[in-house]
């Protein structure tokens, strides 16, 4: 009886142990609930403190950065800035977030968990304005890997300062930078690095209205030294080549046509003063308006731009065409002035000859006659006085033709000289700005 009781007891204990082992095996096979796992990983019971950086009092945290450009545009010359929409991705290792209790290799967490972990204090050094995106939810991504690697991605729109050199405008190439810098951590605590696999990526089909974004990536390091210490800084440079299509249609071609229109006056008769003066004044005023319009969308800089030189030379040619007619008209009328001068000289000589005769006005007798004793009237006559004779009509006509011929010769020379000089200016202008200066910019 006693042996039977012992046998039953051993049987019960055996089955109890087997059941407990099976329960333990089932418990080990089923993963920990996510909420419990997260509380254990970064909750209050975990001892994780988001205020303390990884490797505290140890080596600096290396943060690898890369950006994906969604859109690039709104490049403003007046304010010298540009607008860009990007995905900013930062990746670093936090040993405190390494785990082995959960089977997944990585965890994609809700953006609200970002407040529970440590993050780099990255900011954009040349930022003038920025905003996050919250439609339809916060555009943020947080991913934690088993080895403690943290990926933090965020979508932001930035307005960044871009100092521009407009000397070659509108044939310029601008370099706009994006600087990523640590605000509070010195290089003893935090270091930014560009991702070697793809630091800067651009969306397919990205186009700009006035610029071409060069494909080559210019990535640099720009460590900053302040009174508070040495801070890590990385920068990306975007090389933007301006497209001339808009400016050719809106500025260069209209001003070129205005200059050519001013040359029409060289083929108009010099006697048609209203037509030539009206054409000259109209082209000058139009060119002035065109020149003012070219500067309306540009900042007030102290140096001369390429478009300023073009507009100034075009205005000079148009104004010179107006002055050319003034010179032609002046020379054509010189024969009348010369005849008027000769007429005044003859009158002056006649007056001088009259002053040499005797004047009997004091005796009550006229200067023309003298009463003799015998009653005969003696007419005053001075045989030595020069007699005035008008120049022959042929001489006047020849003089008129001479001056008109000179005036016409100026018009004839202007018909060739103005286009030729303007052509030479164009050759030098386009060679200088499209070839020579363009090569200098690419070398830099």
Swiss-Prot record:
Record-listed strychnine binding positions: 226-231
Residues that bind Zn(2+): 216, 218, 239
GO terms of biological process kind: cellular response to amino acid stimulus; cellular response to ethanol; cellular response to zinc ion; central nervous system development; chloride transmembrane transport; monoatomic ion transport; regulation of neuron differentiation; response to amino acid
Domain of life: Eukaryota
SS bond partners: 162-176, 222-233
Residues noted as binding glycine 1 in the record, renumbered to the chain: 89, 153
InterPro entries registered for this protein in UniProt: GABAA/Glycine_rcpt, Glycine_rcpt_A, Glycine_rcpt_A1, Neur_chan_lig-bd, Neur_chan_lig-bd_sf, Neur_channel, Neuro-gated_channel_TM_sf, Neuro_actylchol_rec
Residue ranges of the TM segments: 247-268, 274-294, 306-326, 413-433
Extracellular topological intervals: 25-246, 295-305, 434-444
Keywords: Cell membrane, Cell projection, Chloride, Chloride channel, Disulfide bond, Glycoprotein, Ion channel, Ion transport, Ligand-gated ion channel, Membrane, Metal-binding, Postsynaptic cell membrane, Receptor, Signal, Synapse, Transmembrane, Transmembrane helix, Transport, Zinc
Binding-site list for glycine 2: 228
Annotated glycan sites: 62
PANTHER family associated with the record: NEUROTRANSMITTER GATED ION CHANNEL
Domain notes: The channel pore is formed by pentameric assembly of the second transmembrane domain from all five subunits. Channel opening is effected by an outward rotation of the transmembrane domains that increases the diameter of the pore.
Primary role: Subunit of heteromeric glycine-gated chloride channels. Plays an important role in the down-regulation of neuronal excitability. Contributes to the generation of inhibitory postsynaptic currents. Channel activity is potentiated by ethanol.
Quaternary structure annotation from Swiss-Prot or TrEMBL: Homopentamer (in vitro). Heteropentamer composed of glra1 and glrb. Both homopentamers and heteropentamers form functional ion channels. Interacts with glrb.
Note: Highly sensitive to activation by taurine despite the presence of Val in position 135. In mammals, Val-135 causes a drastic loss of taurine efficacy. The alpha subunit binds strychnine.
Family listed: Belongs to the ligand-gated ion channel (TC 1.A.9) family. Glycine receptor (TC 1.A.9.3) subfamily. GLRA1 sub-subfamily.
Full protein name: Glycine receptor subunit alphaZ1
Organism encoding this protein: Danio rerio (Zebrafish)
UniProt gene name: glra1
């Amino acid at each position: 009886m006693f042996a039977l009781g012992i046998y039953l007891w051993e049987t019960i204990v055996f089955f109890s142990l087997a059941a407990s082992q099976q329960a333990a095996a089932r418990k080990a096979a089923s993963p920990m609930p996510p909420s419990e796992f997260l509380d254990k990983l970064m909750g209050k019971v975990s001892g994780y403190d988001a205020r303390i950086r990884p490797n505290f009092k140890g080596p600096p945290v290396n943060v690898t950065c890369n950006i994906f450009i969604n859109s690039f545009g709104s490049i403003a010359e007046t304010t010298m800035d540009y607008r860009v929409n990007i995905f900013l991705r930062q990746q670093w290792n936090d040993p405190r977030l390494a785990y082995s209790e959960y089977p997944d290799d990585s965890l994609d967490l809700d953006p609200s968990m970002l407040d529970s972990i440590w993050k780099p204090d990255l900011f954009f050094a040349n930022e003038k304005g920025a905003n996050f995106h919250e439609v339809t939810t916060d555009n943020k991504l947080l991913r934690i890997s088993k080895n403690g690697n943290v990926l933090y991605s965020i979508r932001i729109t930035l307005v960044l300062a871009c100092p521009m050199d407009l000397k070659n405008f509108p044939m310029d190439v601008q370099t706009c930078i994006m600087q990523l810098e640590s605000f509070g951590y010195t290089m003893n605590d935090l270091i930014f690095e560009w991702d070697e696999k793809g630091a800067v990526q651009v969306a397919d089909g990205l186009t700009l209205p006035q610029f071409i974004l060069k494909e080559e990536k210019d990535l640099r390091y720009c460590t900053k030294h302040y009174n508070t210490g040495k801070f890590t800084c990385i920068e990306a440079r975007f090389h933007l080549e301006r497209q001339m299509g808009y400016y050719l249609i809106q500025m260069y071609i209209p001003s070129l046509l205005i200059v050519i229109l001013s040359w029409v006056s060289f083929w108009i008769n010099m006697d048609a003063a209203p037509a030539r003066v009206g054409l000259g004044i109209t082209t000058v005023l139009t060119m002035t308006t065109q020149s003012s319009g070219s500067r309306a969308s540009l900042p007030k800089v102290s140096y001369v731009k390429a478009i300023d030189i073009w507009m100034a030379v075009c205005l000079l040619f148009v104004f010179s065409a107006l002055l050319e007619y003034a010179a032609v008209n002046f020379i054509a009328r010189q024969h009348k002035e010369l005849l008027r001068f000769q007429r005044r000289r003859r009158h002056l000589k006649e007056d001088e000859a009259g002053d040499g005769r005797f004047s009997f006005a004091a005796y009550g007798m006229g200067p023309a006659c003298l009463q003799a004793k015998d009653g005969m009237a003696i007419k005053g006559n001075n045989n030595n006085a020069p007699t005035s004779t008008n120049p022959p009509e042929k001489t006047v006509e020849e003089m008129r033709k001479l001056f008109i011929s000179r005036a016409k010769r100026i018009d004839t020379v202007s018909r060739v000289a103005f286009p030729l000089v303007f052509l030479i200016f164009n050759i030098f202008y386009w060679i200088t700005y499209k070839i020579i200066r363009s090569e200098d910019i690419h070398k830099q």
